[in-house]
Structures are given as C-alpha cells and as structure tokens.
Amino acid sequence: MPTSANKVETAWSALLAGAAETRQEHLAPSPLFILRQTLFCVLAAYLFCGAGMVWNDWIDRDIDANVARTKNRPLASGKVTTAQAFVWMALQVIASCAVLHVMLDGKDV
C-alpha cells in the first residue's frame, strides 16, 4: 500500500496534470476535472503498487520460505502458485494501464 508521502505525490501529480490540461485548452480546469484526475491517478498508483508487491513476493519466495517471519506468505507457503501470482500481477498492471488511458483521455504523453 502506498505511503502517505506517495499519496501526496500522487495527488500533486494529478493536480499538475490538470494544470497541463489548462495550458493545452486555455481553460481553467473545473474542480470536478481535478478530482476525477486525482482519483484516477490514485487508483492507477494503487494498482501498480499492488503489482509491484506481487513481483517482490514472487522474486523473494524461496528466501521467504526459509524465514520464520515470512514463511506463511502465500507464494512462500505454496498457497498460491507462481502462475496464479503472475496472472494477478498482470491483471493489476492491465487495470492500471486502462485507468491511465481513461485518465489521459487517449492523449499521448
């Protein structure tokens, strides 16, 4: 889960995206537009963060299996297969990219 600092950075990024939209359209962005962009940005960051955590657990699964504190993690304990973890990670990445596509309204950045 993102830290508080990451959440602030994410919100700031969305506000900057709103400012960039203003410069392109020569219009002041509405508060609803800024809120929408912020929510999309937070959701995309949350999904990408989740995918990163799955990747980390996947890479560390053999080490985690030998450490008392981490041996009960789903991949380390075998409760989840590497194929299942990969599918879950891929779904999170795809969902995050879809959110970003909607957020950017199909524009290239």
UniProtKB/Swiss-Prot annotation:
Transferase as a keyword of this entry, yes or no, is yes
What stretches pass through the bilayer? 39-59, 84-104
Question: Per its Swiss-Prot or TrEMBL entry, what cofactor is needed?
Answer: Mg(2+)
Q: What is its EC number?
A: 2.5.1.-
A GO cellular component term found in this entry reads:
plasma membrane
- Induction text: The subglutinol cluster is highly expressed when mycelia and hyphae are transferred to fresh media for a 3 hour induction period, remaining expressed under conditions of heat shock. The cluster is repressed in cultures reaching stationary phase or in early germinating cultures, as well as under conditions of UV, salt and oxidative stress.
Q: Which Pfam families match?
A: UbiA
Instruction: For this UniProt record, give its keywords in alphabetical order, as a comma-separated list.
Output: Membrane, Transferase, Transmembrane, Transmembrane helix
**Top-level EC class, please?**
transferase
- Classify the source by domain of life: Eukaryota
Pathway(s) per entry: Secondary metabolite biosynthesis; terpenoid biosynthesis
Q: Where in the cell is it found?
A: Membrane
Q: Name one GO biological process term.
A: terpenoid biosynthetic process
Q: Which membrane topology describes this protein?
A: Multi-pass membrane protein
Please list the GO terms describing molecular function: transferase activity, transferring alkyl or aryl (other than methyl) groups
Q: What is its main location?
A: membrane
What does the UniProt function comment say about this protein?
Polyprenyl transferase; part of the gene cluster that mediates the biosynthesis of the immunosuppressants subglutinols, meroterpenoids consisting of an alpha-pyrone (4-hydroxy-5,6-dimethyl-2-pyrone) moiety attached to a decalin core fused to a five-membered cyclic ether carrying a prenylside chain. The first step of the pathway is the synthesis of the alpha-pyrone moiety by the polyketide synthase subA via condensation of one acetyl-CoA starter unit with 3 malonyl-CoA units and 2 methylations.
The UniProt entry's sequence similarity note says: Belongs to the UbiA prenyltransferase family.
Protein name, entry field: Polyprenyl transferase subC
Q: Which organism is it from?
A: Metarhizium robertsii (strain ARSEF 23 / ATCC MYA-3075)
